[in-house]
């Protein structure tokens, strides 16, 4: 038997996290056993369905890396294009005596429901129209046509319906508790239970993987499968996804749609990994690539209890994938988030890779990374008043002034400034003095270092991270010289410099920050800090 699973979202809104997890499990099960994954669009509710929702659903699945073997854009996989098939199925059930017309009005049914509630009974259809004679050739209402009757399925009154669920185990339902559900509405449209069964038969679905909120529908669907002459597929009902408060995951728990997480700066690999582990386990392993999931996933390892959506765990996973991401890919992915914050997107991909390399050790999302990049991207920054008052004081005025002049006059640092590169002819003229300084600072390795810096600052390097390392090495040597001159420890000068360059007290390593920021902007901000200290140190005018 070839495994065939399906996922059937309705295009009536965004793709919900709990919903897409069911689709993911169906997808992984099909991939594990070399089967086919079918995407079907349940769009019979044309009033609520929209092209925008459909486009978002398809884009969400593609973003997560969930691809389908059969489905859109093929029109055969849209329920709205299969209405004739459902009508044929209903006619067959009517002729076989397995369905009958129901003339009860909505008002009658509502009154009976309220009466059952008052008597503390389960509200089920009482079968008023079940034994009425009818013409099996009765004309079915057309879509949009208001008729006086709906069509109900004739559920057996005696015996039991048994569902051998691959996750929940055996579930036994008394047929007397299963009312005669409506399978074809008076407006000419099929109900979910009929359309789903007919589609599963026609699409040769072998395994139905879905949330356990569908479990009450399952015995009814099993009976419809049998009435249509088809063996039901195997069912796997997954426990619901709950919030940390133990309630069903909803908007009150924060972002719940796939695209909301994308827009919040999560990587698809992180969300896919997290959703796969939400109700499924493989030993103690937490990190799974997509290929590992397809290799190891099995419904037998799905838990029976509800999955708790832990946003901190998802953040932890996202942090892991950010750190493991190829730097060039990460730099490209952060661009929309930079633009959204109102900054011009850097055109130098190499420089952006350098910046991202310093930021990803702290950022848990792409949104955070773009926020942290503000001091690199802004022409001017605002200093945190508390930090500035604490660290930009007269005690560091002379060391700060000395560092400013040291960095400004450094030919090797100027050569490494990819953010503000010199023109080619000037770089050639400056190379000799840069090499001389670098040799004094870095020893015999200086020649290779300077040649790499020349190539990288000109945009010719295949490895911007090497330029970052080389530039940071030069900065460290220059910094160390100033520390020795004033007999200071690193923190005594590094923190004032950090405040001057970034506006705050937390940043990546200060040598790397200077390397990315470049000599020109670094010197500009240090001079502004020196001027601030000088202004505050002057006696107040009489």
Label for each model-derived stretch:
Residues 27-28, 61, 193-195, 497:
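Hydrophobic alpha-helical segments in the ANL/AMP-binding
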Residues 1-119, 217-230:
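N-terminal Rossmann-like or analogous alpha/beta NTP/dinucleotide-binding catalytic cores
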Residues 100-101, 105-237, 242-249, 257, ...:
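Active-site cores that bind ATP or allylic diphosphates and position pyrophosphate for catalysis
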Residues 16-18, 42, 180, 193, ...:
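Acidic active-site catalytic centers that drive phospho-/nucleotidyl reactions
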């Amino acid at each position: 038997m070839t495994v065939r699973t399906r996922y059937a979202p309705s295009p009536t809104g965004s793709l919900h996290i709990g919903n897409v997890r069911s689709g993911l499990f169906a997808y992984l099960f099909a991939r594990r056993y070399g089967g086919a994954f079918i995407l079907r669009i349940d769009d019979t509710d044309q009033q609520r369905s929209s092209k925008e929702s459909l486009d978002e659903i398809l884009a969400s699945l593609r973003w997560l890396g969930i691809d389908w073997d059969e489905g859109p854009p093929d029109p055969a996989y849209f329920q709205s294009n299969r209405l004739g098939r459902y009508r044929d199925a209903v006619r067959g059930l009517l002729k076989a005596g397995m369905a009958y017309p129901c003339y009860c009005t909505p008002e009658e049914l509502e009154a009976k429901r309220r009466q059952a509630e008052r008597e503390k009974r389960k509200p089920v259809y009482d079968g008023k129209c079940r034994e009425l004679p009818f013409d099996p050739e009765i004309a079915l209402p057309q879509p949009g046509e208001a008729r006086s009757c709906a069509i109900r399925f004739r559920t057996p009154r005696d015996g039991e319906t048994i569902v051998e669920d691959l996750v929940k185990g055996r579930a036994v339902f008394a047929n007397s508790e299963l009312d005669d559900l409506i399978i074809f509405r008076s407006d000419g449209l099929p109900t979910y239970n009929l359309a789903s069964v007919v589609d599963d038969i026609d699409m040769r679905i072998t395994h139905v993987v879905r949330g356990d909120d569908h479990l009450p529908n399952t015995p009814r669907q099993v009976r419809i499968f049998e009435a249509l002459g088809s063996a039901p597929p195997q069912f796997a009902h997954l426990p619901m996804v709950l919030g940390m408060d133990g309630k069903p995951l909803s908007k009150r728990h924060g972002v719940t749609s796939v695209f909301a997480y994308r827009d919040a700066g999560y990587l698809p690999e992180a969300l896919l990994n997290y959703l796969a582990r939400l109700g499924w386990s493989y030993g103690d392993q937490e990190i799974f690539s997509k290929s590992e999931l397809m290799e190891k996933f099995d419904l037998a390892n799905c838990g029976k209890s509800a999955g708790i959506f832990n946003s901190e765990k998802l953040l932890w996973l996202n942090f892991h994938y950010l750190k493991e991401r190829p730097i060039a890919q990460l730099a490209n992915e952060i661009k929309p988030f930079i633009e959204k914050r109102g900054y011009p997107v850097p055109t130098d991909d190499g420089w952006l890779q350098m910046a991202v390399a310093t930021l990803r050790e702290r950022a848990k999302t792409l949104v955070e990374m773009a926020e942290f990049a503000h001091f690199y991207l802004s022409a001017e920054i605002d200093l945190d008043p508390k930090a500035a008052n604490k660290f930009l004081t007269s005690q560091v005025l002379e060391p700060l002034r000395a560092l400013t002049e040291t960095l400004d006059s450094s030919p090797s640092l100027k050569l490494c400034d990819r953010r503000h590169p010199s023109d080619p002819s000037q770089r050639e003229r400056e190379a000799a003095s840069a090499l001389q300084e670098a040799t004094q600072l870095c020893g015999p390795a200086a020649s290779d270092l300077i040649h790499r810096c020349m190539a990288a600052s000109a945009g010719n390097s295949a490895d911007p991270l090497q330029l970052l390392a080389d530039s940071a090495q030069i900065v460290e040597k220059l910094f160390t010289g100033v520390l020795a001159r004033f007999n200071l420890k690193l923190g005594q000068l590094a923190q004032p410099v950090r405040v001057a360059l970034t506006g705050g007290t937390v940043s990546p390593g200060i040598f790397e920050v200077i390397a990315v920021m470049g000599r020109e902007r670094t010197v500009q901000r240090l001079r502004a800090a020196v001027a601030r200290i000088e202004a505050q140190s002057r006696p107040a005018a009489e």
